[in-house]
Amino acid sequence: MLLTLAQWLQNDYSFLRVVNYLTFRAVMANVTALVIGLGFGPWVIRRLTELKIGQAVRTIGPQTHLVKAGTPTMGGVLVLISIAISTLLWCDWGNRFIWVVLLVTLGYGAIGWVDDYRKVVYRDPRGMSSREKFFWQTLIGLVAAVYLAFSVSEASNVRIWSLFLSWIEGGMFADVPYKMNLIVPFFKEVSYPLGVTGFIVLTYLVIVGSSNAVNLTDGLDGLVIMPVVLVGGGLGVFAYVMGNAVYSKYLLFPHIPGAGELLIFCSAMAGAGLAFLWFNAHPARVFMGDVGALALGGALGTVAVIVRQEIVLFVMGGIFVVETLSVMLQVSWFKFTKRRYGEGRRLFRMAPLHHHFELGGWKETQVTVRFWIITMLLVLIGLSSLKLR
């Protein structure tokens, strides 16, 4: 919005030309989201407290968590509002990728909001059923995947619909450009052709998987938001490179016109995340809830797909991956041993993995900060793949 206004007025006010620079708008998006989050955070926390929207704590977990009962939750609403306002203020409204990421983020946020609302307001600990939640995640993920399959490969909005129709008429087979291949980091000449169907399947898995992985990681004060900020920032760098014809050619990456604008979204997400961390740091005054965790995970997955860095997301978001694997292994092993021995056994003291370390004697802040440090290192490894290829 401000970009359009600045372009309209820049002939009379030359200093407004600075708004044309993507990096300037990215910095301003970050600052705007940070200010909104810090400014409205106390008010949101008071309102959540007045409405008695408090967190329920399981008695089977670490006993130190019992004091968290009643802490306001659904604070992720503040994060999403900060991201949306900041992004819309500073982005190019004509960029299709911005709208895809925003719609996926807000769509997954809506799923999380309904889940949190049922848990807190209706006092239903189950919230949305797993089947219902998965249905809506799948619907949003597939719609986004189908659209991205053609918008990533085609620079013109006019051509996207005709490409989709030709794909349907061709029995869901079509020739696709190199930029739709699965890029293998650290190897400049290694990529795997996916085809349209393969691209759609991979995109769906990345978006839905990332959303649920971030949600599973959200279990300690400040644990998930800093990795989201770090990974989002790393993906923002990739977005800037992929959207720049010169840099992408120099670094031997496919050029994706319009992808650079996602730097605005990633910067806004980082600013909103840091503002939320101000209130979510131990001892937390507010929790994110599913409304924030599902949305931010979906956002990371969508950005990673657009900039063709699905494997890099897997690397940089290693904490999310390990947390998810710990739950899957715990459940699978428990079911297997129950069938085999008549009694379920556990691989970990408790899943997700952060609870395993807590029950092993680590303090909550130790788990959180150490997971942050690991994420910092993983993000640096991911960023190094820009040049080390």
Swiss-Prot record:
Membrane topology: Multi-pass membrane protein
InterPro entries hit by this protein: Glycosyl_transferase_4 (IPR000715), PNAcMuramoyl-5peptid_Trfase (IPR003524), PNAcMuramoyl-5peptid_Trfase_CS (IPR018480)
A cellular-component GO term for this protein: plasma membrane
Pathway(s) where this gene product acts: Cell wall biogenesis; peptidoglycan biosynthesis
A Gene Ontology molecular function term of the record: phospho-N-acetylmuramoyl-pentapeptide-transferase activity
Main subcellular location of this protein, as a coarse class: membrane
Pfam (any one): MraY_sig1
Record family assignment: Belongs to the glycosyltransferase 4 family. MraY subfamily.
UniProt protein name: Phospho-N-acetylmuramoyl-pentapeptide-transferase
Gene name tied to this protein: mraY
